[in-house]
């Protein structure tokens, strides 16, 4: 009987260690949909998620690290908290972001004036790389940093094959970023 108790204890400890590793150190995360195309495939890629990428214990002499512009992050879905979304950070606290662009992403069309917003403290502004087919901060506003599940560093599964593509801060898919001249527009809340 003690042998079964010992084996049950070891099994529980192994599952607990795996769970802690999966929740705090590294895990795979499926990402499907057109929002992050062409960076991630619409049929579904798996990415490496690092939950501890933005956390450092104070004993190391470092404060909590914040998401930076260009980072790919997984956050809780603002429209349905039971799900997560994978998006790119384009604005951090204090940045002024354009909500309604004054020109198309490829720069071919322009409009009179865009809407701008200053990202509040403790928040980030996230968008999908496929701007024309993404529900993101343009729809639900700034995302609290507390809702960030972790940083995406690599694609590990692509079209049915193992893959190890590094996903860095490449924002070239987002097109040109118009910056308003100083004093021309005042940021206003949503």
Regions found by a protein language model. Give the residues of each.
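Protein maturation boundaries and topogenic segments
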Residues: 1-84, 104, 146-147, 151-190
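Phosphate/adenylate-binding glycine loop and adjacent helical scaffold
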Residues: 128
